[in-house]
């Protein structure tokens, strides 16, 4: 076994996929601004958050298995 440090390719691929998900990120950021002052706790941006990460995960999944051994 080599002494090289193992690098997680998923983290690198996530960074490279973020530019493809700008629309979802902007929707999430707009939502967080809208609900910022909500004292009741009923408003949230869970849907937009998951939409953003779904976009990134979909992009990463197409490339990730090429990097795994």
UniProtKB/Swiss-Prot annotation:
Compartment(s) of residence: Mitochondrion inner membrane
Any single biological process term in GO: mitochondrial electron transport, ubiquinol to cytochrome c
Gene Ontology CC: one annotated term: respiratory chain complex III
Keywords of this entry: Disulfide bond, Electron transport, Membrane, Mitochondrion, Mitochondrion inner membrane, Respiratory chain, Transport
KW Mitochondrion (keyword) present: yes
Top-level taxon: Eukaryota
Disulfide-bonded cysteines: 17-59, 31-45
Main location: mitochondrion
Cross-referenced Pfam families: UCR_hinge
InterPro entries according to UniProt: Cyt_b-c1_6, Ubol_cytC_Rdtase_hinge_dom, Ubol_cytC_Rdtase_hinge_dom_sf
Topological type in the membrane: Peripheral membrane protein
Record keyword Transport present: yes
Family, per entry: Belongs to the UQCRH/QCR6 family.
Domain text: Lacks the acidic domain of other UQCRH.
Function text: Component of the ubiquinol-cytochrome c oxidoreductase, a multisubunit transmembrane complex that is part of the mitochondrial electron transport chain which drives oxidative phosphorylation.
Subunit text: Component of the ubiquinol-cytochrome c oxidoreductase (cytochrome b-c1 complex, complex III, CIII), a multisubunit enzyme composed of 3 respiratory subunits cytochrome b, cytochrome c1 and Rieske protein, 2 core protein subunits, and additional low-molecular weight protein subunits. The complex exists as an obligatory dimer and forms supercomplexes (SCs) in the inner mitochondrial membrane with cytochrome c oxidase (complex IV, CIV).
Protein name: Cytochrome b-c1 complex subunit 6
Organism in which the protein naturally occurs: Solanum tuberosum (Potato)
């Amino acid at each position: 076994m080599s002494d090289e440090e193992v690098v997680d390719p998923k983290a690198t691929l996530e960074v490279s996929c973020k530019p493809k998900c700008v629309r979802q990120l902007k929707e999430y950021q707009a939502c967080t601004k809208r609900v910022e002052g909500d004292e009741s706790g009923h408003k949230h941006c869970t849907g937009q958050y998951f939409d953003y990460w779904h976009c990134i995960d979909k992009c990463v999944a197409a490339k990730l298995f090429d990097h795994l051994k």
